Amino acid sequence: MRNTISSKMGQVLIVLLLLCTVLCRTESALPSGQHSVLLTGRRLMGSGASGPVRSSQSSQAGGRFNDADPIAIDYGKY
């Protein structure tokens, strides 16, 4: 009984060490400027849209022109 517990604890320790090694190596592989780019992207995604989408923007993006279309949603109302 004691041998199985110690062997399982050894396996858990090895897995944790490997996980820490992999995480440290992947973080060091990222360039230092990459972190600021990720934070800027998160800020932009979190800010949301500022006002309703104009028809010229919608047509350039391939949007629909029909107001009765249930898929076309005006996010400026919300």
Swiss-Prot record:
The UniProt record describes its induction as: Triggered by AtPep1. Induced by Erwinia amylovora, a bacterial pathogen. Accumulates upon infection by generalist herbivores such as Spodoptera littoralis.
Locations listed in the record: Cell membrane; Secreted, Extracellular space, Apoplast
Consequence recorded when altering S56A: Impaired seedling growth inhibition and altered induction of reactive oxygen species (ROS) burst
Per the record, the domain of life is: Eukaryota
> Which keywords does the record carry?
Apoplast, Cell membrane, Cleavage on pair of basic residues, Jasmonic acid signaling pathway, Membrane, Plant defense, Secreted, Signal, Stress response
* GO terms under cellular component: apoplast; plasma membrane
The record's account of tissue expression is: Mostly expressed in the whole root system, and, to a lower extent, in seedlings shoots.
Keyword set includes Transcription regulation: no
* Motif SCOOP motif per UniProt: ranges: 50-64
Q: Which residues form the propeptide?
A: 25-43
Q: What did gene disruption experiments reveal?
A: Enhanced root growth leading to longer primary roots due increased differentiated cells size. Increased accumulation of reactive oxygen species (ROS) such as superoxide anion O(2) and hydrogen peroxide H(2)O(2). Reduced susceptibility to necrogenic bacterial pathogens (e.g. Erwinia amylovora) and necrotrophic fungal pathogens (e.g. Alternaria brassicicola) infection and pathogenic induced cell death leading to the reduction of necrotic symptoms in leaves. These symptoms are associated with disturbed expression of various genes related to stress responses.
Subunit note: Interacts with MIK2 (via extracellular leucine-rich repeat domain); this interaction triggers the formation of complex between MIK2 and the BAK1/SERK3 and SERK4 coreceptors, and subsequent BAK1 activation by phosphorylation on 'Ser-612'.
- Give the family this protein belongs to, as stated in its UniProt record: Belongs to the serine rich endogenous peptide (SCOOP) phytocytokine family.
- Name of the protein in question: Serine rich endogenous peptide 12
Instruction: Tell me the organism.
Output: Arabidopsis thaliana (Mouse-ear cress)
